[in-house]
């Protein structure tokens, strides 16, 4: 079961990803985790990535793609994988196709958790975080018992600077522009499946499970 998981910020991609890997026993591979592991293991590519990250620069595609190739070649990916956060561009998607062709592991589905912009705005601007323990709340979906106060330790809740309306709106616009060519690429390939992310979390996952039902665990 070889999957790519997509979705704009706030779509609930992380939640669905956790459930998929738990139920199907495949590794959840995110770009950040891959970089951290490669740097910790001090692989040549990991050290190269670190040199860019330490300077605050973007890691070049060839290094990122090399790290992805190393990761997908590990034993725990024999029965499949869930890629999250990669690819981000059509060039990366084409490189991924080449890697998977070499490994004989074609993509089964690219699952896009689809949520409209207004709903994403509500989800992202409603987030509040405890200043003491870091617990995340949401004014609509998961409010604290007492407004502005953490249930666990009474700490003050705050809104992250990048969760305000203007910043969130800009972030979503940028993400939409970047993501659309990738969605078009995978749609043309016949891999793309849109899942309605507007529903309750459990209903979203029910749709995902129905989709994956035809694939062997």
UniProtKB/Swiss-Prot annotation:
One Gene Ontology term, aspect cellular component: cytoplasm
Main location: cytoplasm
Sequence positions that bind Zn(2+): 130, 133, 150, 153
Protein's cellular compartments: Cytoplasm
Pathway: Purine metabolism; AMP biosynthesis via salvage pathway; AMP from ADP: step 1/1
UniProt keyword annotation of Oxidoreductase present: no
UniProt-recorded Gene Ontology molecular function terms: adenylate kinase activity; ATP binding; zinc ion binding
Binding locations of ATP: 10-15, 127, 136-137, 199
Region of interest (NMP), residue spans: 30-59
Enzyme Commission numbers on file: 2.7.4.3
Region annotated LID, chain positions: 126-163
GO-annotated biological processes: AMP salvage
Keywords: ATP-binding, Cytoplasm, Kinase, Metal-binding, Nucleotide biosynthesis, Nucleotide-binding, Transferase, Zinc
Catalytic activity from the UniProt record: AMP + ATP = 2 ADP
Residues the record lists as binding AMP: 31, 36, 57-59, 85-88, 92, 160, 171
Top EC class for this record: transferase
Disulphide-bridged cysteine pairs: none
Described function: Catalyzes the reversible transfer of the terminal phosphate group between ATP and AMP. Plays an important role in cellular energy homeostasis and in adenine nucleotide metabolism.
Family under the similarity heading: Belongs to the adenylate kinase family.
Subunit and interaction comment: Monomer.
Record remark on domains: Consists of three domains, a large central CORE domain and two small peripheral domains, NMPbind and LID, which undergo movements during catalysis. The LID domain closes over the site of phosphoryl transfer upon ATP binding. Assembling and dissambling the active center during each catalytic cycle provides an effective means to prevent ATP hydrolysis. Some bacteria have evolved a zinc-coordinating structure that stabilizes the LID domain.
Entry protein name: Adenylate kinase
Organism: Bacillus velezensis (strain DSM 23117 / BGSC 10A6 / LMG 26770 / FZB42)
């Amino acid at each position: 079961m070889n999957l790519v998981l997509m979705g704009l910020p706030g779509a609930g991609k992380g939640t669905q990803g956790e459930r998929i890997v738990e139920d199907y026993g495949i590794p959840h591979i995110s770009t950040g985790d891959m970089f951290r592991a490669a740097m910790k293991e001090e692989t040549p590519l990991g050290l190269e990535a670190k040199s860019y990250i330490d300077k605050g620069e973007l890691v070049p595609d060839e290094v990122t793609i090399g790290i992805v190739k190393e990761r997908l070649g590990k034993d725990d990916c024999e029965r499949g994988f869930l890629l999250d956060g990669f690819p981000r561009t059509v060039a990366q998607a084409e490189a991924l196709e080449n890697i998977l062709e070499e490994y004989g592991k074609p993509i089964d589905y690219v699952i896009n958790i689809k949520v409209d912009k207004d709903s994403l705005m509500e989800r992202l601007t409603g987030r509040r975080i405890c200043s003491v323990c870091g617990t995340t709340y949401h004014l609509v979906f998961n409010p604290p018992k007492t407004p502005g106060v953490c249930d666990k330790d009474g700490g003050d809740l705050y809104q992250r600077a990048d969760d305000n309306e203007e910043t969130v709106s800009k972030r979503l616009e940028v993400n939409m522009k970047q993501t659309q060519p990738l969605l078009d690429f995978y749609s043309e390939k016949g891999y793309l499946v849109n899942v309605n992310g507007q529903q309750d979390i459990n209903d979203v996952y029910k749709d995902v499970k129905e989709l994956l039902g035809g694939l062997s665990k």
